[in-house]
Amino acid sequence: SVAVVENGRSFCGVLDCPAKGEVFAASIGGGSRMNGITLSVGEPSDELKVAGPKHFVVPFANMQSKQVEAVGHVPSLAYRIALIAAGRISASFVKPNAHDWDLAAADLILAEAGGTLVRADGSRPLYAGKTVSHGVLAAGHPSLMQGMLGVVAATSIG
């Protein structure tokens, strides 16, 4: 993945997943697309598909009135976040030490599809600064963030 970043924010980004034949792209105010098709996270359904470390997913599932399915390991963090933008995954917890190069394009792709990626304090991450790694993050539909951040706050690694 690659992104153009200015003042800590991504302005355009592309994620290529050649194994799946999928190319995700986004620009500020221009929406997100996969292979030319507009993406939207959509409202969370009755069954949430949540990815990330088990010590976050299990407590999150326990506090939901909806059924939660734990998503198996997706080896590319950027692709996992893009899957949220495409509506294939509802949300993902991101363990500490993710890097700008894993996040900058995917963050914009998710945001332009109506989702959000936030730090444990609820703020959006900044990119291309003095520090290029991040703490725990939560990604998904904005309506899921309060519950996700509650789990992060209650977990010692958060």
Q: How should these model regions be labeled?
A:
Residues S1-R33:
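DPxDG-like acidic metal-binding loop motif
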Residues G13, A26, V41-G42, Y127:
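Short capping micro-motif at the N-terminus of alpha-helices
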Residues S27, G36, L149-V152:
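Short, flexible helix/strand-to-coil boundary loops that buttress conserved ligand/catalytic motifs
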Residues G42-G158:
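An extended, acidic
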